A protein has these predicted regions:
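Gly/Pro-rich hinge or "lid" segments in bacterial periplasmic/extracellular proteins
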Residues: 97-98, 186-252, 262, 373, ...
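Aromatic- and charge-enriched surface segment that lines or borders ligand/interaction sites
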Residues: 109-152, 165, 171, 316
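Surface-exposed binding/hinge segments that line
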Residues: 112, 116, 154-198, 203-205, ...
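Alpha-helical secondary-structure segments
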Residues: 137-142, 169-171, 213-214, 248-252, ...
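Structural transition elements
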Residues: 215, 345-381, 399-401
């Protein structure tokens, strides 16, 4: 079964499937002695008919741990906004590896590639927003072009134009042929609104949202609560065409904005909320072995990695054996236990396993598994000067500091001394491009759609160097190749990944879990491809009460 990147229907011991344009779901729920369900973004099973049911509930209350700031569609993508946006707005499509195009529609009826730069999208002709405005192609073009002009995403500059072809068809043209960029815009960057509603808004929809979503904002108290209620006139009345993210199994959702992490769990324990979204690993332990709760562990889209300063004159320059020695000396499982209390997934490549082009065969290949004897052999063959102190630089966070300290202890076993350099974000962002400031970087990367979206980090682009500061013509050529539509083939992607491992320019360590915790009468949850929860799509038992 290929990955359906956008859906997580996490029923306990349940199976799910997303077809092309609709969702067929079968669930067999058995909660006996089950306290935690590990859910991977995009995981799915195969079923033949839709037998999944949810009670329709009057109200569900949810705690989110991020400040929302505002509800406008085209502002910067803060964590608070991302945790809400797919409840407030709809996108054209969602990722679906079983579809011929890799996408299935929400507002989109069909799409086709015109050329490597242009995608033609046709929307349904019966879409209306909550104010009764008929959504047409001109509104899609307005949304894309307004988003690009706002410039609040690094991807904005990639949009050349979005133009109307006919009343319900647009051409989305990019100025790059990089694979995945238009899909990213269609599935998670550009919310669609009608021009009439947006221009009629006196605050740019900062507080008063008008959209095609199955939910309508009825109350918003900044920094405190957001209330949405089911739209009785939701435009998509064909149940077979309702997207996995557009169900409304609760008549009302009340979000409680709780920015203090410890208070999220307290709100759940004291029945202030029924669902606690994005709970930290330090807080989730109290629910994992407690009756009355379901714990859903989500393998995050961010993963932790190290890279090496491969610039000329640096200690790792032109020395893959030295780099590999470092990797083999690091016990990634020890980091998972020591830093994340076991709440992380071991990485097997410089990629998120849920990416649509991830090769599952990589999971069975050797990937610098901890082997101190092999590390010593490689260190000896490298001829490296082991008297040098290795400077490990990282953005200053509690987890990064803990990981750096553990890595320091592992490398000491190899006879290598390290200096730990943790910097606040602005200084780190400056120093990471300066060869004289570091030898190893420890950081995180997010990967949510394509493996090759990270290839750009290993190439020189204008004045921006590769993350490892390497000047490698073959690496450059492979990185450019696999990011292009024509060059994005399984064979080329495998060659690219094999070369990255062969040269050991970067070592992915693990993906930290994050957790959604619910009352036990919430039998299943749905998240989007970035792991954000959609409470209205949850599966509620008949015994659910607010």
């Amino acid at each position: 079964m290929k990955k359906v990147l956008s859906l997580v229907l996490a029923t306990l011991l349940a199976t799910t499937m997303i077809g092309c344009g609709n969702a067929n779901v079968e669930s067999t729920t058995d909660q006996t002695d089950v306290k935690e369900t590990q859910v991977e973004l995009g995981s799915a099973g195969v079923v033949s008919e839709n037998t999944e049911t949810s009670a329709q509930v009057e109200e569900v209350s949810v705690a989110i741990s991020y400040d929302v700031s505002n509800l406008a569609p085209f502002t910067s993508a803060t964590s608070g906004r991302l945790s809400l946006i797919q409840t407030l707005y709809e996108y054209l499509a969602y990722y679906d590896a079983d579809s011929d195009t890799g996408l299935s529609g929400i507002l989109m009826k069909e799409c086709e590639k015109i050329d490597n730069y242009t995608t033609r999208v046709t929307i349904y002709d019966y879409i209306y927003d909550s104010a009764g405005n008929h959504l047409t192609a001109s509104d899609v073009a307005f949304s894309f072009n307004t988003w690009a002009e706002a410039g609040n995403s690094v991807k904005c500059k990639l949009l050349d134009s979005c133009t109307v072809v006919d009343e319900f068809t647009v051409d989305i043209k990019l100025n790059t042929d990089s694979v995945g960029d238009v899909e990213n815009m269609m599935c998670g960057l550009v919310p669609i609104v009608t021009q009439a509603a947006y221009e009629a808004s006196d605050d740019g929809m900062i507080e008063k949202v008008v959209s095609t979503s199955p939910y309508i904002v009825t109350d918003y108290v900044e920094g405190s609560t957001l209330t949405v209620e089911k739209n009785p006139n939701y435009w998509q009345t064909n149940e077979d065409l309702v997207s996995p993210f557009s169900h409304s199994n609760a008549d009302k959702i009340v979000y409680h904005i709780v920015t203090e992490a410890s208070q999220v769990s307290t709100n759940l324990e004291t029945d202030v909320v029924d669902i606690a979204a994005n709970m930290t690993s330090s807080e989730v332990g109290r629910f994992q072995n407690t009756d009355g709760y379901n714990v859903y562990a989500i393998a995050g889209t961010n993963f932790n990695w190290i890279t090496f300063n491969c610039s000329e004159g640096g200690m790792f320059y032109n020395n893959p054996d030295f780099r590999k020695a470092i990797c083999y000396a690091i016990d990634a499982n020890g980091i998972i236990e020591g830093v994340f209390n076991g709440g992380a997934k071991l990485s097997k490549a410089y990629a998120n396993p849920e990416c649509i082009d991830y090769n599952s065969e990589w999971d069975s290949e050797e990937y610098y598994e901890y082997n101190i004897e092999k590390a010593k052999e490689l260190l000896a063959s490298s001829g490296a000067d082991t008297s040098q102190t290795i400077r490990i630089m990282y953005p200053q966070t509690t987890n990064n500091k803990s990981m750096a300290q553990i890595i320091q202890s592992y490398l000491l076993e190899l006879g290598l001394n390290c200096e730990l350099l943790g910097y606040e974000s602005a200084l780190y962002q400056t120093y990471k491009y300066e060869a004289g400031e570091w030898d190893i970087i420890l950081d995180q990367k997010q990967s949510v759609d394509y493996v090759t979206s990270l290839a750009s980090t290993l190439q020189v682009s204008g004045d921006t160097p590769a993350i490892c500061l390497v000047d490698d013509e073959k690496m450059q050529d492979l990185a450019v190749l696999v990011q292009s539509n024509e060059g994005h083939t399984a064979e080329n992607v495998n060659e690219y990944m094999e070369y990255v491992k062969e040269q050991c320019y970067v070592y992915a360590i693990c993906q930290e879990n994050f957790y959604h915790v619910t009352e036990s009468s919430v039998n299943g949850i749905v998240t989007n491809f970035k792991g954000w929860l959609l409470p209205g799509c949850s599966t509620f038992g008949d015994d659910f009460e607010r």
